[in-house]
Amino acid sequence: MKSISNNIEIQKSDKTYNISMFIGIVFSLLTTILCEMFFNSIDLGPKNIDFISRVTVVFLTIFSIYGFYVRSSIKKDLKIKNFITIFMVLFLSIIVLKFFQFLTDALINEIQSSDYGFKLTSTELTLAFPMATGALLIQSVMNTRMAAMFVFIWSAIIGFYFVDTIFLFLFTISSSLVAVSSVVKVRSRGVYLRAGLNIALLSIPFSLIILLSSESFVYIDFLICIFSGLLGGLFCYLIASGLTPILEHLGNYVTDMRLIEIATLDHPLLNELSIQASGTWNHSMVMGMMGEMASDLVGANPVLVRTGAYFHDIGKIKKTMYFIENQQGEDNPHDKLTPSMSALIIKSHVKEGVEMAQKYKLPSLVIDMIKEHHGTSLIEYFYNKALNDQKDNAEEVDELLYRYPGPKPQSKEAGILMLADCIEASVRALPEHTKDNIQVLVKKMINKIFAAGQLDECDLTLNDLYKIAGSFVKTLTGIYHQRIAYVDNKEANVNTILK
């Protein structure tokens, strides 16, 4: 069976790779045609050897870069929408470049036709071109791997079609790489401003290169270069910050900024959860703190984990009193139900949570975490209760009725959420919240979940689990810290009140 399963996985992998290669051919061909349309007039005459050789080299270069990154990419990157987005951003970058070329030529002609006391060159004004805008956009909505692919394709295009201006190629690849490294974590719109400033700072060494390569050294030329660099950084900031929300919407991308915007009490679901199920809301808040701290240690996305924690139990809104954290000393409605019916109600909060999330159009990554946060785990309390009720016919108890439908966690973030969910609830039930008690329970619960195979389909390693355990202990010890008992001096209190 294991051999058959491995063969199926290999076949699926080969199929995915073949589809990706086909997409790469189409992508490379369309990009080459786009470049020819804007940078050269296409002539299909049989004697135009330069055209054929240039197009062939450009196509093969783009396809080679694409192929290299496809081989090193993970499955979630190999989506058609990603390459459509990259093509659109390349198209936008070309339009912006042509527009700035037009402005530059017009400005140079104006300066030359009038006596302003100084001259401008196209090289100096090149620093004002927002060549890194595309890299900023791709990094914002995708990841560093896809952004790097874009940078090298875009730089290769500039290198082929602007052979006489090697300076533009060097500036394009340098500013784009600086832009990518500046927006690794986009958690506020201010990160684009920082990227713009970094790009502007890059203009200083390029300004020196321009001056050293010129025949005469004039201070005003240096100032023009610096000013052009500042404008270039400003243009990158304005264009990227303005277009990122549009790309998010068109491609349905889930960025940290989008997650931060929905993970507040302003969202109707969280507002209703905090009012209707305050116990569940408190549990979710603590989980968010636990998951966020642990995620940073294992290379997961802390913003996604925190947002997933806030929304993971929204399905409990519909039947709040059937969950113990919301009962607050009132009668337990499960006392009047059979174990199988109780398990059905408990399980239903996952399905209802997914339906509510879809109704409010939550990001797909958050919906996946709602589905996966219990995996296929067993609802032990009611399963054991059913076994006790059927002592003589224990084999008649169907275990599947007491298991969540799954799927198991498919990502590090979902795995961390599952661990935080189980551990927070268990620690809350401890009679004494000492550090030793918390530490023992955290390790016990992680070992139990791991042994049950619930983490088999996510990327968490044993080393990751060790780090997560330490982080959970630290966070929970801080939350449930012990305090000294204050002396109840009633007389002092009365005197204070009467004064």
Task: Write out the residue ranges for each language-model feature.
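Structural signature of hydrophobic alpha-helical transmembrane segments
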Residues: 48-60, 113-128, 163-172
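Divalent metal-dependent catalytic cores for phosphoryl transfer on phosphate-bearing substrates
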Residues: 265-434, 448-452
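Short helix-perturbing small/polar motifs within transmembrane alpha-helices
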Residues: 13-19, 34-40, 60-107, 134-144, ...
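Alpha-helical membrane-embedded segments
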Residues: 203-204, 224-249
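Extended, domain-scale alpha-helical bundle/helix-rich regions
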Residues: 1-67, 433, 446
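Structural signal for the N-terminal portions of transmembrane helices
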Residues: 196, 217-235, 305
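Juxtamembrane or sensor-core-proximal signal-transducing alpha helices
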Residues: 65, 69, 210-215, 237-260
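Juxtamembrane inter-helical linkers in multi-pass membrane proteins
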Residues: 3, 114-115, 253-271, 313
